[in-house]
Every structure is written in C-alpha cells, then in structure tokens.
Amino acid sequence: MRCDNNYSFSILFSLLLILILDSKVVSLSTSCQSKSVCGNINIPYPFGIEKGCYLNEWYKIECKNATYPFLFKMGMAVVNISLPGDDGYNNPVSYGSIRVKIPITSIGCSRDGKESGSVLNFTDSPFYFGIGNSLVAVGCNSKASLTNINPSKVGCELNCTASKETLPSKSIPFFDKTGCSNNKLPYYSSLCTKNNGEDERSCDGNGCCIAGLLDSEAPQVIGINIESFDHGNSTKLECRVAFLTDDVSPFSNASEPKRLFAKRYATVSLGWVIQTKNLSFVNSLSCKNTKEYDNSTYNIKLVTSCICNNVTISGTDYANCGCSQGYEGNPYLPGGCKDINECLRNSYGQRQNCRESDTCVNLPGTFNCIGNKTRVTMIGVGSAFGILVLVVGIWWLRKFLKKRRMSKRKRKFFKRNGGLLLQQQLNTNKGNVEKTRIFSSRELEKATDNFSESRILGQGGQGTVYKGMLVDGRTVAVKKSKVVDEDKLEEFINEVVILSQINHRHVVKLLGCCLETEVPTLVYEFIPNGNLFQHIHEESDDYTKTWGMRLRIAVDIAGALSYLHSAASSPIYHRDIKSTNILLDEKYRTKVSDFGTSRSVTIDHTHWTTVISGTVGYVDPEYYGSSQYTDKSDVYSFGVVLVELITGEKPVITVSNSQEIRGLADHFRVAMKENRFFEIMDARIRDGCKPEQVMAVANLARRCLNSKGKKRPCMRKVFTDLEKILASQEDSLVNIENDDGADDEEEGMTMINIDDSQTIYVTAPAPSIVASSSSSDVQPLFPHPTWI
C-alpha cells in the first residue's frame, strides 16, 4: 500500500489510536500452552487436549501415545488443524479447517467381495464438509456417486480403454471442477482455485474419475455408493474404490484400486465454526460483526483486529471469526489477533517496498510510506511532542518536590508545635480525653479564605480568632496562635488536652487542632453572639440590659467553673476568667472559653506555683504576692465579673471625683463598706429588678473578692447560692442581713429570707476548717511562663 503526504494527519491520528487500544489479552494458562502440540501437529484454541484447554467436547483432542491426535467425539484421526487465514489469503471471514482421515468405500476388493464404507454424519456438530473436497473413483466399468446431499445425482463414471483419446471422461460434475463460480457460502475455501482451462487429463474417466464437491450449503451428511456395469464381459467382480479427499494430485489412470484399498483411508477437509447457542463466548472476543465492520469508518476499521460472521448450517446458527486485514493470530482468543508489521512483511509474507527516498511507517492494520518533506514534518511534530513531554515531566517533578518539601515542613511544624507532646498527653490521659480531630492546614485555609482579615472575630494576647466554614457546612471558630518559641508550647498543648477533657454545655467545645502550620491552630465550635464584655459595656439593645438575664448568665458561668473545679476528671483552674472570655450564643446561653493559661491539677493538690499571668483588674491580689494560683483565684476573677454585671462598669475605672484609676473590685468593696451600693448599681437594671435579689448577689460578690483566698467561698458554694437566688419567686420577700461590724478580712453571715416557708443561710467556711487544709497547699509546683 502506498500513501502520499496528504495522509500525514491520518498517520498521527492512527498513532494516537495505538495508545488507546485495549491492552487486555486473555491468554490460556501456561499448562494449556505447553500441551498445545501432539506429535508434530499444533492444536490451536478452541481445540485442546487437557480439560479446560478446549471450548467444549466437540473440540477435544485426544493425543494417543503423545504422537497421534484424534478428534475425541468423532473418533477420527487428525492430520492438521488450521485457523482462519492460515492459508495466507488473510480473508477476515474465511473459515478454519481440520483435516481428518475417513475410510475408503470399496467393492470387490475384499475376499467376500462385499461393498465396504459408511455414511459420514456430522449433524449437530460444528463440522461440515469443506468445498475443497472431491469425489475420486478408481477402477473399471462402474459408477461412483454421493448420497444424502442435494442435488441427489452426484458422481462420475469409470471406463477402461486402451486409448485416452477415443473415450472422453464420463464425469458427472456436482459443481464445476474449480469450486469457485457457484459458491453460495459467504466465504471462500482456502482450497478454491480458479479454472484456467488447463488440461487435467490425469484422472479423466479412463480408470479414474473425479467429481468436485462444490456449491453446497455446507453439507454435514455424505455417503458414497459404487455401482458396477461389466456389460457381461467378465464374470469376475473387479476391485473398485471411491472416496472423498481434499488432495487429488496423487491420483491418475495408472493408480491401482487395490493399492488404494490397502491404504484404507483418505484425508478430507472439514470446515469448523462456533455454535452460537450461548453467545457469551463470541461476545467475549470483542470482535465486530461484518455489518458493523462494513458500516465503520476507515480509521475504525484500521484498529478493528477481528471480525465475526453469522452462518447457518443445516438449520443451526453458527459463527466463524477471523483476523481482519493487517492482523494475524488466533481470533478465538481475546486479543489474539496481532497487528502485522508491514514494513517487515505483509500478510503474504513479503516485505512492503517503499521508494528509497521514503520511509516505511507501520500503522495499526496498515502502513505508510513517508516522503522527505513529510519526514521533516514528522520529526518536527515528534520533537514538539518530546519537548511537551519534557516540560510536563519537569512540571510534575517540581510539583512532586514541592509537595515533598511541604510534607517535610509539615512534619517539622508538627514536631515543633508540640505534636509529640500532644500525643504523649493524649496517651497519658487515655480514657479521659475525647478523641480530637486533627485538621489539615489546607482544610483550615479553605475554611477561612486563607485566614482573610475579613474573617477575624477577635484578637487577644494568645492569638487571633477567625470565622470559618468546614466542608460539611459547620461554622467554626479557628484560633490561630501567635508565633511562640518552644518554651511556650506547653501552654498550647495544655489547652488542647484540657478542652478535650471538658464536656459541659456552658464550656466552649473543642473540635480539633492543626499542628502542620508554622503556628499552632485550634478549631472550636462557633458562638455567634459575641462576648459578655461587648453586651455589658457597648451600646446595645438586647436582653443583657435586664437583671433577670444577667443573673441567668452569672448562674451559667458559676456552673461551668464549678464543673471545672470539682466535677471534671481532674480539677481544672481557668486562670483567665473575664467578661471577654464569656461567650453568648443566639439564645444568650453562656459559653466559657479561652483555656490557653488553664492548669489541670491532681486531686491531692490545691494550687499551681507559676509566673504571674492574667488580665489587669481580674487577677487575684493574693496570687500577685505568692505566685500560687488556687481555685479561689478563679473565684476572685468571677467576683469581678459579678460586679461587672451589677454595676455595668469595666474592670478598671477612673473615679470621677479624683480622676484616680482604680480597680473595679476595690471600688466595689469601698462602696459596699460605705453603704453606697445603690449609687454604683447599673441604672439599666434598676427598672424591673428586685433590689433584695441584687443585694444578695452583691454580698456574694463581696465574699468572692475577699483579699484572703481562704475566706472566699468555693465555686460549688457560689453556684449553689446563685441558683437559690435565681429560684426565689417574684413575690418573695428577700431580706438581706449583714454583719456590718465585720471588716474586709472577716467573713460575716448573710441570711436570705424567702417568704415565711424557707430560710437560706449563705455562709463561708469557718477559719478553723480552712486552716486544716492539706499541707500540699504550700507545696510549690513546677513554674512555667505564660503567653500573656
């Protein structure tokens, strides 16, 4: 085949199709391949010797003595098995053939003179008589004919004379001698030859005659009959033989019938196909049928390796398959048809020749001859493709190295940000720590728009909080810590561990953390309504202006701190209680947050000894002097928050008369001592509040702000008292009596009378009981710097 330069783009397209060809090849097992030869005869699939190596029993070959193959179900010796296209014609719809030995029919050759022979019957099998077979009769004065086929009269007549010229052949042809012109089958036999009018007088009726078995609809039943006519010239019955064969070249008038009878067999060519009762096998071949192939485009035909055609033999449907033009191999194996490299040889075994100035290029199913100009174009295209592959390779390598570098950095950050310490803490607290999710840095960057400034919710001494949205739709608060040195990583890990231990409705929930970034990051549940400081000290028109809501908030805070101090798995000191760390949700429910400086202590310890940390106005003055932080230090900070709720003032105020800057706690204690409480009471809560109730809370706040920690009530006591105050009925008369003689260093008794039915006494622990606490109160623990 020769193509000009206009097919350049077709070549490129075909080369592309090579890359997308299905590479799946279902091959027989190694055991089947090693047993695919019997003697010197190849046994191709669907035929096979061992079980599992043949399609079904019709194709089973019995190899006797490892030398002689037999068609097991038919009991016939096999001479050769060929696949479609093995003849070299490479016709995609030719049939496979199997040559077998059949008995010779004779009369007058045996001692009893009886006729021998049998009817050959292949009904319901995948085998039929091929169109390359001929009826050969040898002897004198007889007629040989075929039976069980249409037309019914098929045969030839034998006469013996001294001269060939005086007696023409009496052959009665069934088809024309050549077997091509009247063929009605949709395929051609590999043994079909054209009649060129040559003189074929070697077996012409004088002692030998031939009738071609042609133009039949693939007969499966054939018998042979020999009829003698001696015309009374002899009383002795001479030997005569007749048989079907696919090879007539050895026979001539000189052949002796007794010699042929002694041979006892002749070879006949049988065509074989595949029964289509079960289409699963044919469909598994992925071959196109002839109709699909004929309707396909040229490029599709080039990459179609095999074709199957449906035929009907004796009323039964069969299929025969073959490798398409430009392919060779076994069409009955998936992927068994392979492309022929026409630049080395074509389907006829010859090498394709291009001009010396051209280059032969093999293509799927064909080839092309490329001229010099086209070659330059192809070189250019190939070079461009190579450069593209190089660029893509460099890009991929760069991406791989970058990803590897980022992975290495993430591991470095994980270690630097305390990942190993966190794992150790989580393992130490196993069973007490709820499983914390580890977020990837990419996930948090996506959730916060790369930590956009527009997503900032607030900033503090420990870091910046961003609003984010996870892929599952949850809104979260992402706390990105400030850059810290390794000496301060313990505080960050401490916050993760502490929050993992806490499970309380009034404590903000930790969802997870990320340690892959340069600075550590925490992910909390999002609390949408801001913090308590904003609601108290900034102009707003909401429920926090009412005393009932403020009292409810105070109870919630006290409940959370009481849980941290006594109900958690181990006591936890918050160490930074302030109104900005009290968050409110959309229903004004309280959430205590920011545990960066929190500490967890064992049950037999009552304090931490550490470097001073906290927020001005909230820090326990006793903590300043001793550096020992106890649960009563949290009580003091809570007392300041109570005063904020009562007065509406900030924790550090400027006295209007003297312009003196004073802590709110000191200002409150002075006002209470001078009985000026109602002067400092927030005007926004006066309307609608119960003064006795407010006074009861004020006295409780005063006790929380006692300068001596041991005289302050514990958080559980504070929580209980606030719940009782909140539970007082609106029509109840609440009377507060306080020992005015008690100084700031002593604890008085506060009595709250509610109606006539119940009396509640709120009392601090006696000094003698407080003094009897464990000696561990003064045992210093390991100090550590804070993030403040």
Swiss-Prot record:
Organism listed in the record: Arabidopsis thaliana (Mouse-ear cress)
Residue span, Protein kinase domain: 451-726
**Notes concerning its domains:** The EGF-like region is specific to this family of proteins and seems to consist of the C-terminal of an EGF-like domain fused to the N-terminal of another one.
Q: What is the gene name? A: WAKL11
Q: Which residues carry this modification: Phosphothreonine?
A: 610, 615
Catalytic site: 576
Query: How is this protein positioned relative to the membrane?
Result: Single-pass type I membrane protein
Q: What class of enzyme is it?
A: transferase
Q: Where is this region: Atypical EGF-like?
A: 306-369
Q: What does this protein do?
A: Putative serine/threonine-protein kinase that may function as a signaling receptor of extracellular matrix component.
Residues assigned to the Cytoplasmic compartment are 397-788
Care to name a GO molecular-function term for this sequence?
Answer: protein serine kinase activity
Where Phosphotyrosine occurs, the residues are: 524, 623
EC number(s) of the enzyme? Answer: 2.7.11.-
Q: Where is the signal peptide?
A: 1-27
Which residues does the record list as glycosylated? 65, 80, 121, 159, 233, 253, 278, 295, 310, 372
Output one GO BP term. Answer: cell surface receptor signaling pathway
GO CC, any one term: membrane
| Subcellular compartments | Membrane
In which residues is ATP bound? 457-465, 479
Q: What is this protein called?
A: Putative wall-associated receptor kinase-like 11
**Known catalysed reaction(s)?**
L-seryl-[protein] + ATP = O-phospho-L-seryl-[protein] + ADP + H(+); L-threonyl-[protein] + ATP = O-phospho-L-threonyl-[protein] + ADP + H(+)
Family affiliation: Belongs to the protein kinase superfamily. Ser/Thr protein kinase family.
- Keyword Cytoplasm in annotation: no
Transmembrane parts of this sequence: 376-396
- Disulphide-bridged cysteine pairs: 308-321, 343-360, 354-369
